[in-house]
Amino acid sequence: WLSFGALIAIIFILPIFKNLPAQSLWASVSVNLFLLPILMYSFYEFPIYGVFLNLIVIPLLSVLMAAGLIGTMISLFWEHAGEAIFLCCRIIFRVYEHSCEAALRLPFARVVTGQPDIWKILFYYVFLFAAVLLLRKKEENKGEKRSGKKRGFLSVLLVGIGMTILLFTAQVKDKITITMLDVGQGDGLVIRGPEGKTYFMDGGSSDVKKVGEYRIEPYLLSQGIGSLDYVFVSHGDQDHISGIKELVQRQKTGVTIKRLVFPTQTVWDDALKELAEMAEKEGI
């Protein structure tokens, strides 16, 4: 979906910016405008600095694909020469990796939105396509300056309305929600308080691998929870802390934890001591 979406954006949206300088920037803007709902629906968040990262990714992509294709063909006849060309691909992948890691270290790098409803996505695309059609009409009537400015303003307004619908989530006040997560043989309790605070109690499993990364974290992000105010640990059994350990290890890329609450230190076992040390290293 991401590849098809990027292609549609370049074909359908980018031409309206053809007379503007810095075409790489506008290509990135076009792609991000179209992919925004897809990213939110699939990953429950979007990267603020994605527009600028694409200024690195898009120009190098053609080099990467060409080097990969040429390297594959040459390696059929001359393996060492093919490996030398593949080195270029590895360098580009390293550039991508380090650029993304650097962007993640910047403030507000990720905006956790949760998974939007389908109707919100449809409304967003209706407003986006309407804005693009208006701007295309503006290109066809270049002589009508006043009319063109009105269409430009209206197009920006339409995209803004679409984004507002897509991003807006009504918060239900004076209500407590409690969700029991299916983590196999284990526990995982998510609580949202009436004041908007989020709590998580005993997240772990003894029979599901990487339960934190693949079950607990995706659920939290899908609900728009990018940060947990309190995480409570009752004791150190695997089916109570294995997922919490993963969340602690993924503080830079996953759900952040503000406070980790342990039982009294007199009942700590080795597992709880290890978790406490791990949390301290991550600044929790």
Regions found by a protein language model. Give the residues of each.
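Alpha-helical hydrophobic membrane-insertion segments
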Residues: 2-16, 122-126, 130, 134
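Non-globular, low-confidence helical/coil segments that flank catalytic cores
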Residues: 54, 65, 73-284
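Alpha-helical transmembrane segments of multi-pass integral membrane proteins
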Residues: 4-108
